[in-house]
């Protein structure tokens, strides 16, 4: 199956073609010969949902087969359907219906991402890491990837910006201790130490996003005020001394001119000093 086909549809479930092409190859595979998808973007599974699915499977069986690929003789990797696999595993069933497909790593990674995006089950961090993985595997731009997964380029860029945060903050998003908007606001802080410290404040005070943003403005505002206080007195002192010196020189030049001497007076300001040039002609 060409890789481009996995990204070529937006309205129809991209998994449909796999099922249609492999429907004649449904097999009952031993559970102990199947292992999870190495490219599975989801790292946190809702156990309550798996238990609910297991109860349904206990009554009705596995209605939709999982999709796998054969990695070595009689050993299979899940391409799609890991929740079903986990539910069946919890029921201690020995076999599960599966469709065997011959797909490469890039196709498997793409399918895993698409399946989870369609169900909106990924956390923002999982989604961001999945995008990064696909970009690393494929020679494509964010814009091309956005078109292929039905997202805007800015949406993908914003998700991937979350990966600039410290691992501690990313983990907090992953376990839903803070929201994506909380995490995004932390990007305004300059250092990881500030971000981690504010994460602790958010958790301790149970701040919402608005309160978090207000606290960030306090932090940034205090830093700016401290910088201003440190430099302002020095600038004022220098300005006063320079002004006195400049006025004294100008008064002297004016006095000389008033006495009938023709001279040129120029001044130039650089980053480090004022330069004054006085030219007095040798001949009148």
Curated annotation (Swiss-Prot):
<protein>
    <recommendedName>
        <fullName>Nucleoid occlusion protein</fullName>
    </recommendedName>
</protein>
<keyword id="KW-0132">Cell division</keyword>
<comment type="function">
    <text>Effects nucleoid occlusion by binding relatively nonspecifically to DNA and preventing the assembly of the division machinery in the vicinity of the nucleoid, especially under conditions that disturb the cell cycle. It helps to coordinate cell division and chromosome segregation by preventing the formation of the Z ring through the nucleoid, which would cause chromosome breakage.</text>
</comment>
<feature type="DNA-binding region" description="H-T-H motif">
    <location>
        <begin position="143"/>
        <end position="162"/>
    </location>
</feature>
<keyword id="KW-0717">Septation</keyword>
<comment type="similarity">
    <text>Belongs to the ParB family.</text>
</comment>
<dbReference type="InterPro" id="IPR050336">
    <property type="entry name" value="Chromosome_partition/occlusion"/>
</dbReference>
<dbReference type="Pfam" id="PF02195">
    <property type="entry name" value="ParBc"/>
</dbReference>
<dbReference type="InterPro" id="IPR023705">
    <property type="entry name" value="Nucleoid_occlusion_protein"/>
</dbReference>
<dbReference type="GO" id="GO:0007059">
    <property type="term" value="P:chromosome segregation"/>
</dbReference>
<dbReference type="GO" id="GO:0005737">
    <property type="term" value="C:cytoplasm"/>
</dbReference>
<dbReference type="InterPro" id="IPR003115">
    <property type="entry name" value="ParB/Sulfiredoxin_dom"/>
</dbReference>
<dbReference type="GO" id="GO:0003677">
    <property type="term" value="F:DNA binding"/>
</dbReference>
<dbReference type="InterPro" id="IPR036086">
    <property type="entry name" value="ParB/Sulfiredoxin_sf"/>
</dbReference>
<dbReference type="GO" id="GO:0009295">
    <property type="term" value="C:nucleoid"/>
</dbReference>
<dbReference type="GO" id="GO:0000917">
    <property type="term" value="P:division septum assembly"/>
</dbReference>
<dbReference type="GO" id="GO:0045881">
    <property type="term" value="P:positive regulation of sporulation resulting in formation of a cellular spore"/>
</dbReference>
<dbReference type="InterPro" id="IPR041468">
    <property type="entry name" value="HTH_ParB/Spo0J"/>
</dbReference>
<dbReference type="InterPro" id="IPR004437">
    <property type="entry name" value="ParB/RepB/Spo0J"/>
</dbReference>
<keyword id="KW-0238">DNA-binding</keyword>
<keyword id="KW-0131">Cell cycle</keyword>
<dbReference type="GO" id="GO:0005694">
    <property type="term" value="C:chromosome"/>
</dbReference>
<dbReference type="Pfam" id="PF17762">
    <property type="entry name" value="HTH_ParB"/>
</dbReference>
<keyword id="KW-0963">Cytoplasm</keyword>
């Amino acid at each position: 199956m060409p890789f481009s086909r996995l990204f070529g549809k937006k309205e129809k479930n991209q998994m449909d073609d796999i099922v249609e092409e492999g429907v004649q190859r449904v097999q009952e595979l031993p559970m102990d010969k199947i292992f999870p998808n190495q490219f599975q973007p989801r790292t946190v599974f809702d156990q309550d949902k798996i238990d609910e699915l297991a109860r349904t499977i206990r009554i009705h069986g596995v209605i939709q087969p999982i999709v796998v690929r054969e990695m070595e003789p009689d050993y299979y990797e899940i391409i799609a359907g890991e929740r079903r696999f986990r539910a069946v595993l919890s029921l201690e069933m020995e076999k599960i219906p599966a469709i065997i497909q011959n797909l490469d790593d890039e196709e498997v990674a793409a399918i895993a991402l698409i399946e989870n995006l369609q169900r909106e089950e990924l956390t923002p961090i999982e989604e961001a890491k999945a995008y990064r993985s696909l970009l690393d595997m494929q020679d494509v731009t964010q814009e091309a990837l956005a078109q292929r997964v039905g997202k805007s380029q800015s949406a993908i860029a914003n998700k991937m910006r979350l990966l600039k945060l410290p691992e501690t903050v990313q983990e907090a998003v992953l376990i839903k201790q803070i929201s994506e908007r909380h995490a995004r606001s932390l990007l305004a802080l300059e250092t990881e130490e500030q971000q981690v410290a504010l994460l602790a404040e958010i958790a301790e005070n149970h701040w919402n996003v608005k309160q978090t943003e207000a606290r960030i403005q306090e932090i940034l505002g205090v830093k700016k005020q401290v910088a201003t206080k440190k430099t302002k007195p020095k600038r004022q002192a220098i300005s006063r001394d320079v002004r006195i010196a400049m006025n004294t020189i100008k008064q002297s030049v004016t006095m000389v001119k008033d006495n009938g001497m023709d001279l040129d007076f120029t001044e130039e300001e650089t980053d480090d000093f004022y330069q004054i040039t006085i030219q007095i002609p040798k001949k009148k």
